[in-house]
Amino acid sequence: MRRLTLWVRTASTATLVGVGVVVAAVFVAANAVASLDRTGAQPPAPASLAELTLRELGGNGPEGITANFRYANALVPTTSLVPQASAGGSPLPLVTGASGRLWYTNGRLRMEFQTDQGDTQLVVRGTRALMYDASDGTAFAATLPSIATLGRIRTGLAGASQLLGRVRSSLAISTPHPGVTAGRPSYTVHMAPVESPGLLSKVALSVDADTGTPLLLDVYGRRQTKPLVEFALSNVHYGAVDPSVFKLKLPFGMQPVPVRFGGPPSLGATVSCTAPPTLGGLPLQSCREASRSGELPGRLLIYGRSFGSVVVLEQPGGGDPGGGLWALLPGVSVGGAEGRELVTPLGAVVRFARGGVTYTVLGSMPHAVVEAVARGL
């Protein structure tokens, strides 16, 4: 003790300050670790994939969700997207990603994408959506396609094991891994296409073990070490959400620009097909009638199998294939016909008109394969 006292008396001020800082840092770190041990979430008990599937599809979910989110999208190369899709020199957050806040309850969603140029607000109520971009003062209103598949699964699930049996023929799904995500007990599942030549490598999904809420979604392309798309929640809180949150007031006198989304076509019976038996090295697997309400029936062709397939939608009428939202995409020539095209690390889509028919060709395949199918039609 006397030696310690002597050292303290003879040590320089700088030495004493340095020792004091180290001791304080160790004390703070120890208390932080102890706090985590007391209040931190713990991984849930192991669960089989069938148990987790039944819990996810059969549960009702929380009353409401309030959370921060981080959204990153490296799919769409902004240099190839026309300038109309950017505002103030900064691409729209829906294209490149952003961070922000979200609220959700009973089919209603509000998201605030926060950027340096100004926030973008998105409110969805059922099939109606309203978006306001403060960076350039524009608003859009849309009616989204109605998709009732999830509701049918929730009310008519005969058995999670049977459902998984059908899915596993084309998708390899890992055993749920217990862990902690966004401060919540969670299960993480990895999914990858089975023997697919397509560009999708795998999808990683983490869900809340208690509520089934998706907490983290990562989508990877082939030969990609980082996710091409990521959506992550943080600071998640469950409970009632004030209904006023979902009321978005536009500036006085502003009228939103209407945007139309065509719903998915209804598929009919298999029909006789005069399409080429092979395109882009892929065999023709299916040819079915496809139609939308109020439109002449067309055809839906599928070349290849599962995730390694290219889908062709043929619609009667040789209207402008670059109208509406398609006008945002770069132009392309397909066998002398002008069209629109979008190429991403996860696949490509080509749309053009020829001979009184509008063709939409898409697939999670290399760009050259999708274009070869389009040119062979």
Q: Where are the language model's segments positioned?
A:
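Gly/Pro-enriched, hydrophobic low-complexity segments
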Residues: 174-254
